[in-house]
Amino acid sequence: MSTIFDDIERRDRSPALHTEDSFSFLNRVATPEWQRVRELVDAWYRDYPEASQTDLRGRFRDSDAAQHYGAWWELYVYTLFRRLGYDVAIHPALLTTTRQPDFLVSRGETAMYVECVVALTRMGTISGDGGGERSWGPCPHVVDTGFVVMRLRAA
């Protein structure tokens, strides 16, 4: 699959409806600025490893915000690391757990695991898979920017 979005003629220029999920809006809206967004997302998607495209596409198209935004964030982070010159392995196996982080990124002698997390709130509660913090094991380095918390650990 080389596209996330449907190959359709778009004529609806109306803004997003209050009840409309993000993907449905992006897929239907017919304005030039949103066409550029679709083209950019599809370009990133074409560079994503083919073996993992079906899963990512399904989650990106999901009406559940946690799935949609999680897939969007994974695609963005994957593209970022690739453009920074890193090799990116998707869902690498770990020796100490059956869980798999989103990526193992490496360049030269530098390697790190990356887990992409999107926290959404609805009426004061965290939504999404598990509803809590995910941990891959001891992480001695923690960076809290106030917006994003990053835990760094050598791979």
Kindly give the residue locations of the regions a language model identified.
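Charged, low-complexity intrinsically disordered tails and linkers
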Residues: 1-56
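Acidic active-site catalytic centers that drive phospho-/nucleotidyl reactions
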Residues: 74, 102, 115
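Metal-dependent nuclease catalytic core centered on acidic motifs
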Residues: 83, 119-155
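Active-site beta-strand-loop-beta-strand hairpin of nuclease catalytic cores
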Residues: 105-115
